[in-house]
Amino acid sequence: MAIDLVEIEANTSVLADEFISHRLGLIPLNSKNVDDVIYSRDCDCEQYCELCSVTLTLHARCTGDEIMRVYARDLVVDPLRANQWVGNPVITDPEGLGTVICKLRKGQELRMKCIAKKGIAKEHAKWAPTSAVGFEYDPQNKLRHTDLWYEEDAAKEWYVG
């Protein structure tokens, strides 16, 4: 499952609608019992329906003076959905917040409806199985993942002209 369609009703944040839509598409969604959802290409509906999609809503408004972060946990699955597990954002951080979608300042608002569909990675990368990805800077290549050159002494090795 991944968010495929985003209907933005209000976006007064500094981020463009397309940027937020792209971020939403990459948020991992729970796919437990995803077999209850059929592929949209196999469905008889026009665009989406209850059989081939899950509807999520997001409404966040910053009323205080502090910067407000909008998290994946703020995405709410349609309460009328029979299977409540499918489509919920996967939240693995200890605080239980999930991925940051955007930040809002006082008076800014984000209101949208998201449609999550079942798909395969051959169609789009958002349907690829994901896991946590880490990055650590290794300036001296001590882990020896590659046989790249690294500088011993920048002052001696680089020409100053």
Positions of PLM-derived features:
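Protein-protein interaction/assembly regions in multi-subunit complexes
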Residues: 1-161
